[in-house]
Structures are given as C-alpha cells and as structure tokens.
Amino acid sequence: MNSSDVSELLIFSGSSNVGLTDKICQYLNVKKGLISRKIFSDGEIWIKFKENIRGRDVYLVQSTMPPAENLMELLIMLDAAKRSSARRVTAVIPYYGYARQDRKDQPRVAVTAKLVADILTKAGADKVITMDLHAAQIQGFFDIPLDHLYASPLYTDEFENKKENLVVVSPDVGGIKIARSYARKLDAGLVLIDKRRPEHNQAEVMNIIGDVEGKNVLIVDDLIDTAGTFVAAVSALKKLGADKIYGAVTHALLSGNAIERVENSAIDELYVSDTIPLNNLAPNSKIKIKTSAALFAESIIRSHHSESISSLFEIDKS
C-alpha cells in the first residue's frame, strides 16, 4: 500500500455501514472524517461536514441497503460535498442497491439501476467505487468513471486449502463467467444450475448441468436475499450426492427469515462479505463474514494516487 501523501484524502461514512468505514480507515491509517447527521420529525435527512473539505479528495462510504433512506442520505452527502468545494468526490458504494432492476424485461417498467446512476452523477459524484454489481452492463450506465471491484480474492484465498475434489457451481446462467473464473483459479470443475423464476424472490431449480456426486461443492453468487433460491440449490445438490457444500456470496441481504433458512439447510459453511452489516449472527453460525475493507482501502488509496486498480484482481472474466 502506498500510504504516502494522504494529506488531501478524506473519508466520511454514511450511516449504513460505519463498521466497514472504520476498518477502511484503520487499514489506511487515516482518521475518519467528521460529519453530522440528523433526522427531522418528518423523516427528512440533514447532513453537515464538520471540517473543511475545500480542495480535498473526498470519499463517501455508503451502502444502499435498505435502498430508499440510505440512497437519499448518500445523495445529500454528495450534494453537500460538492457545494463545499471538494476537489473530487467519490461515492464508495459497497453494495449498489437497485442493481437487479438493470433492464426493461417487462412492459412499462423502469430501468432503476440506470436511474440511480444518473442521480448519483447529478448529485455531484465525480467517480464511483463499488463491488460485484449484479449485472456487468450497469458499468455502462455511468457517464463518470466507475471502479468495479471483485470480492473473489476474499474467497479464493479461503478455498485454496479446501480445493481438493472441489467443483464450483453457478446458480444461474448469468453467473457462469464469474463461476468459471473461480473454477480456473481453484483448478476445479464447473457446474451450472438451470432455473426459472416464476415470481420475484422465487426460483425453481430445473436442472443441474455437471457432476456433483461425491464432490465438495462451492456455490458462488453476487448476492443472497431471501435465501429461497440458494437453499433450493443446496438441497438439489445434496440429493445428487454432493459431499460438503459451501457458499461464497458477496452481498448478504438476508431478508426476512433468510438466516434461519441458511442455518437449517444442508450447507456446511456460507462465506459472505461485510458490504452489508450483519450484527445478529450466532457465534456458531454457518455464516462466516470476510471483510472487504482491504480491497476498498486499496482501491481508495490507488484512486487517490491515480494508480492502477485492476492489478488488485487477477480474475479471468472470459
């Protein structure tokens, strides 16, 4: 890490993931910026930077889960930073909400992922840093630079010691490229689950393409929400004779009873990142958290020094 000359660097945290921001600042050995946030009786959000940011390189860390309030807070932070004459303002969005609304797949629906990109730019973002977007084409929705990080180093390092007799599973066709990159990195086989989704947050496992009998299985995905699809995949793999079953998922939304579903499933361990805070896990939980702080910290300091970020990720996306 090149930590020299960070005098113009300032990192501020929104309210959605203060813990991750603290870890980023600790990694970089910089003090977290001071900011005031108030919620008025009618729900309006008020933001004030408590230190001078004129001419500074400002990074605002805020995941947008749940999206409505946290996105609005980020927009207000961006506007306040721009109006305070920051030299450059970067929105660091560990989890980019609305990413699943990335295309017009039905009549009379919005492409909300594009809308969010537009309003972030309009609010004052000069650049965006995010991780494992649900759809790669979202990168093209922005008219400003976007650094797209990958959580894969967190998990491939973990599974270097567990790769014997391992196959990597993509839970759908859309994730096959990232699953293939894991498989190549771990020298493992590749399996695809063919599924259809009759309704939102519901998926029916249709067919498993590949051999899992007697194999250790690693399911990789960008997010886990209600866990219904994930648990169904675990069950289907187990019925086909899979031995140990692991998961590596970047964004742990874990809505509703998702944690209970995971704990009661046949999975051995589910690894997730801290792009979304998880504070209610039991000590012996099957869900294991891997911090993404170093990846975000390195991307911030390299961005600050105008250095390459792609070298952080030796990932084959072909």
Predicted regions and their residues:
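PRPP-associated nucleotide enzymes
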Residues: 1-318
